[in-house]
Each structure stands twice: as C-alpha cells, then as structure tokens.
Amino acid sequence: MTDQRGAICGAATLVVKVGSSSLTLPGGGIDVRRVDDLVDALSEVIAVGRRVVLVSSGAIATGFPAMGITHRPRTLAGKQAAASVGQGILLAHYASRFASHGLRVGQVLLTVNDLVRPTSYRNAWSTLDTLLGLGVVPIVNENDTVATGEIRFGDNDRLAALVAELVRAQALILLSDVDALYTAHPDSPDARRVEVVEDIDTLDVDTHKAGSGVGTGGMTTKLEAARMATCAGVPVVLAAAVDAPDVLAGVPVGTYFRPLATRRPRRLLWLADAATPQGQIVIDDGAVEALTQRHSSLLAVGVTRVHGDFQAGDPVTILASDGRVVGRGIAQFSHDEVRVMRGRSSAWLAAEMGPAASREIIHRDAMVLSRRRKAEPSSRNQKSSGSRVTS
C-alpha cells in the first residue's frame, strides 16, 4: 500500500476543500453535475463510518448571476452582496443532494477573528466536533458577507488547513481545477507532475499559475496550506476535483505531501497558524541556541530589542538578531515591562523588581519554533496572510 493510499484510506476524519472553479460554471452559477458528483463521492466515504468536513468556496460565483450581474464583482461590497445571495443557494443544493444519501449538513461560516482569538477558536472546534459527532456534514466557508479586507483569509486553502488542524483530521484534500503540482506552468512542455513532496521548503517549482477567474486561490496559497498542514502532522493531497472519487479511494493521483512532524498539542495550534502576532521580541545568539537546541524558555537576559504594543498574554514573534523568525510565543509581560527587563539576569530582576519579574518572558510550553526564515510585520492590524510558523 502506498503512503498516499494508506494516509487517505486510514483517515477517520477528512477535511476536503473544493474551489469555486470546480463547483461553478465559467460565467457563474452552480455546476450541478460537478457538485452532485462531489457530494456522491463524499457520501460514500461517510457511509463507511468516516467523518468529513467540507470546506467549500463558490458563494460569490454562485451569487452574482442570481443578482443579474454578468461578471464577478470587483468591489468588496459587491462581493459581499453576491456572497450573501450565493451562500444560501449553494447550501440549499448541498443540503438537497446530501439528503438524497440520508445525510444532514450544517453551515459553518468563519472569519479570521474566529480563529485568532483563543476563545472563539475553542468554540469553533466545539461546534465542528459536535456536528461531526451527530453525523452532520459541516460545510465551512469564509464569512465573505462580513469579513473586511483587513480581517479575511482571502482564500479557502489556508482556512482548510486550519480546520484540518482544528478537528484533528488525519488527512487534508485540496481539490481544484489543477490536477497536481508541476515543476513549471502546466501548459509548458517541460512541466512534470510532482508525485510526492517530502519537504515543501526544498521544492523547485513555478507557482505563478494564477487563480481561476471565479475564485481567489492559486498554487501559492495551496502550497502555503500544504505547509501549514504537513507541519502539523497532517498529510495533504492536491488533485483535480473530477478525480475526487479516486483520491478518496486512495488512488495515487495528484500530488501527495508527506507530513513533516508529529502533531502539536492542541493548545499550540492556534498559536502556530491562526494567531496574529502583536509584536516582536529580538533575542541574541545565545538565546537562539537555548531555544532551538535545548528547547529552553526565553529569559529576559537574552532579549535585546522589543517592537510593537503587546500585552501579557498576547502572541508575539521571536526574531534572531539578523531578522530570522525563531518562532512564536505567548508573552508573560507587556511590551513596556519587557523593555525594562531586557538583558537583565533573573537574579537581578528578582532582587530589584520582585520574584514575579524573574519569570520567563515566554515559557517553552507556550512557544512554537519555526522552520521559516522571513520576518513578520509587527502590527495589531496586520493581515492574517503573513508568514506562518511551522514546527
């Protein structure tokens, strides 16, 4: 049995993401045959006792023809209006087709804020887990109607990766109009299908294939989603939506991304992939070694600079002196306190500021180390599409 077949066939919980272009017609509106084929394939999987979360795009592309508009809206307000119309139409069709298999569906609309706030993150998990436990098929989409440019995922690929982590899925399947990852643009005569990816960071491929005319995602976002999922221990398959039955049966089609790590504790999932860092803490080389080689906590003595306006309990990015991202963590002190404490030994802090000040700036159990190199922006209003931390 191949790795891909074993990963898919052995998965008790699957997250399946399907893009707009695989659900709707080129001019907008539901492609009934393709939606029905997808639902039929998923229903067969559910019938044998496996759990499926469907992350579905397509609300905007479904909605704008119903509003009498001939082209996909370009303004945020236009897109939100189309989404409000299309989401109901799309869900109704899903509900009808799943009902023909004796299954119920539940709509789950999420925004970035739902997954960057710990309380909302836990509530989202509880809702999805309850639906799955009741035998209901959760259909997840970004809440385009209320999301603004500053607080939106912008694509459902990364949302699907977060949902896969959230529900502790054993596999993530990304379905679109692209049948696999290629070494070059698929139209190029030199393009070769990449069958298996061991480590995304070592890939040498051209990802500049734009998203379809009815969706927002492209190959770059799919690779980012695959990175997020595999670094959380979730295997990923990227394939064409028309190949969904084969993918679900474990047939080695598309591109298979092997997981890179064991699963993180649930408390770290939010921090690693969903949290928005509120500041940056720069540390010296000794502290970098202590964190990365000995998995130590971050002490004040190793801090050299502080950026941003964070409070105790906020997520922050940990940077090396050369700007490399070391990881993320939950600060135990505010930015003002860390500025005063930086470079001081624990003994000095205890003597001069009291025992509480000698605590770790970031405890090792509230820290996720990174494989990434690029620094993240520091702002309370930064977009969620910044660099992700992967352990």
From Swiss-Prot:
Residues 370-391 are annotated as: Disordered. Its EC number is 2.7.2.11. This is Glutamate 5-kinase. It comes from Cutibacterium acnes (strain DSM 16379 / KPA171202) (Propionibacterium acnes). GO terms for molecular function: ATP binding; glutamate 5-kinase activity; RNA binding. Pathway: Amino-acid biosynthesis; L-proline biosynthesis; L-glutamate 5-semialdehyde from L-glutamate: step 1/2. Substrate binds at S57, D144, N156. Signal peptide: none annotated.
